[in-house]
Amino acid sequence: MIKTVLFDLDGTLLNTIDDLADAGNWVCAQNGWPTFTVAQFKLMVGNGIPKLVERFSPADARTPAQLAATLAQFTARYDAHKEDKTAPYPGIPALLDALKAEGIQCAVFSNKADALCGGIIAHYFGTGRFDAVRGNRPGVPTKPDPTGLYALMTELGADPTATLFMGD
């Protein structure tokens, strides 16, 4: 029986792709680079913001210094506009409430920066629906590496054989 459900954030709980694409395209336009469709951005996401920035940056703009500058541009723009179009997927708040009513622990584990995750969750889902919210933190590899997931399960006292992860 499942006793704990861990959720990814972007693309699982929240439809964030439009705000991610808008921020990415703004950075591209500011730098005179080609822009992309939302469908193209969907193919670029899934391994954290630094990897997304690398993927939309032209090959000749991928030195470590250039990527750091582009990441700073993207982060500033996204932080200012991360709630413009983002919304929970239909049925997600009701699902979370049903899981909690059954006594199932719920937590978030995302490749999005840890500093952003708590505020985003509070904004869209309030408090009390999640037992823990964890984003990308220094020293913890991003998904698909399972290190952070195992650490979160340990923190929650969750049995891995009774835990479900939803997302990528």
Where are these regions (language model features)?
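Substrate-recognition "cap/lid" segment bordering the active-site pocket of phosphatases
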Residues: 84-87, 113-166
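Helix-loop "lid/cap" segments that line or gate small-molecule binding pockets
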Residues: 27-28, 48-63, 120-123, 152-153
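An amphipathic alpha-helix signature
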Residues: 21, 25, 38, 42, ...
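Metal-dependent phosphoesterase signature
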Residues: 55-94
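Helix N-cap/coil-helix junction residues
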Residues: 33, 59-62, 126-127, 158
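Active-site neighborhood of HAD-like aspartate-dependent phosphohydrolases
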Residues: 1-43, 57
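Substrate-recognition element of Asp-dependent hydrolases with the DxDx(T/V) motif
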Residues: 24, 92-122
